[in-house]
């Protein structure tokens, strides 16, 4: 399986980067404290897909915010940037489930193809997508470097 090493140090809080891995986009977001708090405040029964969909936890684990990140590094969220409905690429900092301050939204994703909304942990909240955005296998090599794959 192909791997890719990523340096997280240049990604500032509130910023998201997109990179290509195995021919698909991967979103890496340095989440704000408010984005993390919002994700943790969601009750499991409110989720359309209650399964974590993460290669880093056992299959079937609940979609808690803790199960969507690796270890105690909750500020970085790594996910495949492919909508689980029909494979479009969602837009970041959009949708109805991010942190809204004034007229700006931070965190959250919106798929423009058919209207799926994902929250600040990449969990499907509304729209036709059946599952949460998938979290690929990754590990921390250092405090600021990860290996995906």
Report each predicted region and the residues it spans.
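Pocket-edge structural micro-motifs
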Residues: 8, 21, 29-30, 80, ...
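Rieske [2Fe-2S] iron-sulfur-binding domain
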Residues: 44-149
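Short, surface-exposed, low-complexity cationic segments
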Residues: 30-49
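Short, surface-exposed charged micro-motifs
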Residues: 18, 27, 137
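Short acidic, gly/pro-rich beta-turn/loop elements at beta-sheet edges
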Residues: 16, 29, 38, 121
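Short hydrophobic-aromatic micro-motifs
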Residues: 26-29, 148
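C-terminal segment of N-terminal export signals and the immediately downstream linker at the start
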Residues: 1-24
């Amino acid at each position: 399986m192909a791997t890719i090493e990523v340096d997280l140090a240049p990604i500032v809080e509130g910023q998201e980067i997109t990179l290509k891995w195995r021919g698909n986009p991967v979103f890496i977001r340095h989440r704000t404290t408010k984005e993390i708090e919002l994700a943790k405040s969601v009750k499991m029964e409110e989720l359309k897909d209650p399964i974590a969909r993460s290669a880093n936890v056992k299959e079937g684990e609940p979609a808690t915010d803790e199960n969507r990140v690796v270890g105690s590094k909750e500020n970085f969220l790594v996910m495949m940037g492919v909508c689980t409905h029909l494979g479009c690429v969602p837009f970041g900092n959009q949708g109805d489930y991010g942190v809204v301050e004034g007229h700006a939204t931070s965190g959250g994703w919106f798929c423009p193809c058919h209207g799926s909304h994902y929250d600040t942990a990449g969990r499907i909240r509304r729209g036709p997508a059946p599952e949460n955005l998938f979290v690929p296998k990754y590990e921390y090599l250092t405090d600021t470097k990860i290996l995906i794959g």
